[in-house]
Amino acid sequence: MADTGYYAGYQDDVDVDEHKRHQALYLIGIILLVTVCLIVLWVCIMLACYVPGFLKKTLEAWLNSSSLMKRRVASTLTRTPFEATGPERERNWDARRQSTTVNPASQPNTGSVF
């Protein structure tokens, strides 16, 4: 072996098999891919456990909240005036329902089907 100026324990890259390098890179890639998949799976499981609890707390807070806030949200969602969403509307429901069932012929028929 010719003296190249390096110490005797040094091996040149020419001696290393190219196939072994590719195997090492594939192994590192597979390990990283499995690690990322496990992390994504863990995050999905944590979200699946967190979301129902969040919804439960939100709905419980909603049920315990003031009726004023419920009326505001209802008026926003249904696009009815805020004044028409109060308890008077609930009290008048029976009267309105009876007036439509007594005289259904007075309702105009548009001929459309849902």
UniProtKB/Swiss-Prot annotation:
Biased composition (Basic and acidic residues): 86-97
Protein's UniProt keywords contain Lipid metabolism: no
GO terms for biological process, alphabetical: transport of virus in host, cell to cell
Keywords: Host cell membrane, Host membrane, Membrane, Transmembrane, Transmembrane helix, Transport, Viral movement protein
GO cellular component terms given for this protein: host cell plasma membrane; membrane
Compartment(s) of residence: Host cell membrane
Region span, Disordered: 79-114
Membrane topology note: Single-pass membrane protein
Biased composition (Polar residues): 98-114
Transmembrane segments annotated in the record for this chain: 27-47
Predominant cellular place of this UniProt entry's protein: host cell
Family membership: Belongs to the nanovirus movement protein family.
Role: May transport viral genome to neighboring plant cells directly through plasmosdesmata, without any budding. The movement protein allows efficient cell to cell propagation, by bypassing the host cell wall barrier.
Protein name: Putative movement protein
Organism annotation: Faba bean necrotic yellows virus (isolate Syrian SV292-88)
Organism phylogeny: Viruses, Monodnaviria, Shotokuvirae, Cressdnaviricota, Arfiviricetes
